[in-house]
Amino acid sequence: LAGMLREKLGWDIEPQNIALTNGSQSAFFYLFNLFAGRRADGRVKKVLFPLAPEYIGYADAGLEEDLFVSARPNIELLPEGQFKYHVDFEHLHIGEETGMICVSRPTNPTGNVITDEELLKLDALANQHGIPLVIDNAYGVPFPGIIFSEARPLWNPNIVLCMSLSKLGLPGSRCGIIIANEKIITAITNMNGI
């Protein structure tokens, strides 16, 4: 997988940048509780969803109450009763309490696809605040590609990219894939081994 992503997408990625989990729900449980919740120093960190609505399945992935905060989107009205929602960067608040930013691409259940430009802006903001940008790519690019608008795959050491084999037609496999920097992969591997 690392070789394919390096060859096809030009990502600087090695096997040490990949962890497998018992499904993508397990992956998000690990990530949400690694970057959010009560810290050793007593501070509480939260998962920021820059768009709402977002996947309802995340609600059960935390060990604590009030783990999540979301932002109201800008809604673009399109012809024939259609709409698209976008990140409202003007009102997006990233503070000391933000432990990570998380977005699904495409968003479940609406199928909204965050644009490449929005994704790059979120990545820049996450970098600026020293927090990871987690992308739930269960339906997106580079695979399984169940996406109906233009979207360029994005990964760098500050991005945690999550994928799922079940969306490739292998639901019985219960295999989630996490692509991240080695420090995060080491933490996930340790959590996965318990």
Walk through the language-model features, giving the residues of each.
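Conserved core of the PLP fold type I
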Residues: 1-129, 134-156, 160
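Glycine/threonine-rich helix-loop capping motifs at alpha-helix boundaries
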Residues: 193-194
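Active-site PLP attachment segment
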Residues: 150-188
